[in-house]
């Protein structure tokens, strides 16, 4: 009888693990942390998450040579919404990406979304294997 009582607890034990290893979380981890182009870019610092599955989100950087930050946000939504991932903008700015000389400069603000934490952006870029050897300067 005690064995059956112990087995009745099994769904409560397994449920959190099933939630942690669901396909929604795998798709969140599968989103690249950094996507920026060469040259001068506008960029957004974005917190992504899935409702009901994750307690904390993942912060990503997206940048492109476009007219305004809203265009970048639209492309982020096109990329993430089909996967069921939500995006919250933390701020924006500009990145001067000189890939030939392995230098980057992060500066400025977004008129639409406000200023991003440029130091946090630098840390994310340096953790990415493509940009770990770059000299990244931040100007607030």
UniProtKB/Swiss-Prot annotation:
Protein name per the record: Sex-regulated protein janus-B
GO cellular component terms, A-Z: cytosol
GO BP, sorted A to Z: cell differentiation; sex differentiation
Binding-site residues, substrate: 42, 110-112
Gene giving rise to this polypeptide: janB
Keyword Cytoplasm tagged: no
One MF term in the entry's GO annotations: protein histidine phosphatase activity
Stated family: Belongs to the janus family.
Record's function text: JanA and janB regulate somatic sex differentiation.
Coiled-coil ranges per UniProt: none
SUPFAM superfamilies cross-referenced by the UniProt entry: PHP14-like
Active site: 69 (proton acceptor)
Pfam families referenced in this protein's UniProt entry, alphabetically: Ocnus (PF05005)
